[in-house]
A protein has these predicted regions:
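N-terminal leader/pre-domain low-complexity segments
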Residues: 1-36, 55-59
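Short structured motifs
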Residues: 20-23, 68-69, 80, 89-91
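An anionic, turn-rich surface loop/hairpin at beta-sheet edges
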Residues: 64-85
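Well-ordered beta-strand positions in beta-sheet-rich domains
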Residues: 23, 81-83, 117-119
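Intrinsically disordered, low-complexity terminal tails
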Residues: 112-123
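Core FKBP-type peptidyl-prolyl cis-trans isomerase
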Residues: 37, 43-68
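Beta-rich strand-turn-strand
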Residues: 42-48, 85-114
Length: 123
């Protein structure tokens, strides 16, 4: 029994220093994408969403109180992180909400700019 606890604790030390992924769905909706990710245990203020060079990153820091005395402990503080390659989207349209342990991000496609035919004058 004690050996199992030792290995579980050692495993937890290594996992705390790295990012863990989380389960997510990416849906194609009428005008863009809807991304739904499971980040249960995170507080809204501990979730960061960034977009740069076509990559959307969602990161959630989940904190578990380390000051308590535990009889058994399986939950640990950790950082969840996922990246999504979305290509050319309207970055000003990105919106997010957090509800019941799910982060939901809405992203619109970039509107196509119709280019008019241009006649070139020959000099």
């Amino acid at each position: 029994m004690y050996i199992e606890d030792l290995f579980r604790d050692l495993d937890g030390l290594f996992k705390e220093r790295s990012y863990q992924g989380f389960k997510a769905d990416v849906l194609v909706i009428e005008n863009g994408y809807k991304i739904v990710g499971e980040v249960a245990g995170a507080k809204k203020e501990d979730i960061v969403i960034d977009y740069e060079d076509g990559i959307l990153t969602i990161e959630a820091n989940i904190k578990v109180d380390d000051q308590e005395q535990y009889l058994m402990r399986e939950r640990r503080s950790r950082t969840l992180r996922r990246t999504f390659s979305l290509g050319d989207i309207d970055e000003d349209s990105i919106k997010a909400k957090y509800e019941n342990g799910l982060i939901v991000v809405f992203v619109n496609f970039k509107e196509e700019v119709k280019k008019e035919k241009k006649n070139i004058i020959i000099e």
